[in-house]
């Protein structure tokens, strides 16, 4: 008897699965995936980033990975600090997860206009998109739609360290963006000949782990095969964490040398 192989989960399937207990996120995620404007913006953002500028992935795959990172990070952080919308008494943890999902998924769509100030262009482009998606999520609550939209726009505006995130959710979106730093993302520009400290250091990042912390609420481990990965950690991830004043006290950050790598460093180095 031939054993049938289990179908391989796609990245999209994995992201959808993490929202199985949150109906708000399920609705929003399906709306995002089936929205022609959203998908075209992601496609064209990637075209700007990779084809025209020689940058790493800023399209659909990046959006999915950042959404997954953000949701996982928020889950662990909520054990030590409540999301701002919960602290302020205007929403629930499910609402906070929705803010993080939409902020993470849409944060780079302004790249279709320009890399410079893309956070501002994203806010301009996605405001009407958010309006129609949130009408589906909260069909009978206009006030809630407007309130949640404001949270999402703040998170997107602050994701690139140009502005300080004043909510937990906004800080999570920025950090989740930086967590997509593994060599898989850097491989395309690297193979196209865009070799610089950014792409070379990213090629040294094997894996990123988000887990329950020992001394702080969350522990982030960046697994490296080469010491050059330290640049990626300090210039991108550490800056994003330090830019989120409400979260830095809850995150411990470690650079960890992979077992097969040359031991220029000790097995792990605490960064934060």
Language-model segments: which ranges?
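His-Asp-centered metal-binding catalytic motifs of divalent-metal-dependent phosphohydrolases/nucleases
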Residues: 66, 90-126, 151-159
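Inter-helical turn/loop segments and adjacent helix faces that build the functional surface
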Residues: 131-144, 163
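Short amphipathic alpha-helical segments, especially helix-boundary/capping motifs
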Residues: 40-48, 98-103, 146-147, 152, ...
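Membrane-interface starts of transmembrane alpha-helices
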Residues: 93, 141-149
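Divalent metal-dependent phosphate-bond-processing catalytic cores, especially two-metal-ion Mg2+/Mn2+ enzymes
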Residues: 1-33, 54-57, 68-94, 106, ...
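Glycine-/proline-rich flexible loop or hinge segments
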Residues: 45-58, 103-110
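Short alpha-helical hairpin
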Residues: 27-50
């Amino acid at each position: 008897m031939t054993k049938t192989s289990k179908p391989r989960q796609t990245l999209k399937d994995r992201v959808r699965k993490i929202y199985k207990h949150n109906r708000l996120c399920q609705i929003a995620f399906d709306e995002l995936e089936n929205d022609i404007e959203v998908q075209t913006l992601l496609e064209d953002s990637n075209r700007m980033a990779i084809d025209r500028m020689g940058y790493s992935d800023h399209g659909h795959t990046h959006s999915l990975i950042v959404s997954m990172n953000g949701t996982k990070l928020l889950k662990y952080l909520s054990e030590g600090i409540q999301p701002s919308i919960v602290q302020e008494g205007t929403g629930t943890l499910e609402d906070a997860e929705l803010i993080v999902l939409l902020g993470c998924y849409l944060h780079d769509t302004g790249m279709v206009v320009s890399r410079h100030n893309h956070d501002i262009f994203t806010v301009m482009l996605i405001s009407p998109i958010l309006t129609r998606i949130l009408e589906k999520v909260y069909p009978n609550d206009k006030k809630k739609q407007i309130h949640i939209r404001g949270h999402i726009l703040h998170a997107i505006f602050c994701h690139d360290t140009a502005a300080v995130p004043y909510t937990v959710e906004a800080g999570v979106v920025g950090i989740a963006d930086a967590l997509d730093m593994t060599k898989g993302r850097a491989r395309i520009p690297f193979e196209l000949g865009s070799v610089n400290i950014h792409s070379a250091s990213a090629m040294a990042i094997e894996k990123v782990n988000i887990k329950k912390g020992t001394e702080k609420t969350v522990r982030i481990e960046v697994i490296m095969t080469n010491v050059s990965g330290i640049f990626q950690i300090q210039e991108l991830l550490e800056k994003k964490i330090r830019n989120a004043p409400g979260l830095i006290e809850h995150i411990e950050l470690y650079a960890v040398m992979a077992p097969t790598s040359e031991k220029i460093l000790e097995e792990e180095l605490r960064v934060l």
